[in-house]
UniProtKB/Swiss-Prot annotation:
Name recorded for this polypeptide: U1-lycotoxin-Ls1e
Tissue/organ expression: Expressed by the venom gland.
Organism lineage string: Eukaryota, Metazoa, Ecdysozoa, Arthropoda, Chelicerata
GO cellular component, one term: extracellular region
Intrachain S-S bonds: 44-59, 51-68, 58-86, 70-84
Propiece residues: 21-41
């Protein structure tokens, strides 16, 4: 039974990894606009750091590239601004948890 769970976890991880790469390819047009504005950076943005000005500059985690996650913040003046940070999406967290659990069990 545990072998089946580990195989399923590995399949979920591989599918999530390939889908994250596919999503990155779909966002290529946004990347081209960033390159046109010469905002490319050689250094990546670490996890939990702000990525508002460079939404494609997040570093790579253990298994997946961090994604720039944005929220709308309302200031005391009532102005709405968008704030973004590099983080791990929930489905990537679940896949990493399953792989980590499998590594602890099977060495």
């Amino acid at each position: 039974m545990m072998k089946v769970l580990v195989v399923v976890a590995l399949l979920v991880t591989l599918i999530s990894y390939s889908s994250s790469e596919g999503i990155d390819d779909l966002e290529a047009d946004e990347l081209l606009s960033l390159m046109a504005n010469e905002q490319t950076r050689k250094e990546c943005i670490p996890k939990h750091h702000e990525c508002t000005s460079n939404k494609h500059g997040c570093c790579r985690g253990n298994f997946f590239k961090y994604k720039c996650q944005c929220t709308t913040v309302v200031t005391q003046d009532g102005e709405q601004t968008e704030r973004c940070f590099c983080g791990t999406p929930p489905h990537h967290k679940a896949a990493e948890l399953m792989v980590g659990f499998g590594k602890k069990i099977f060495g």
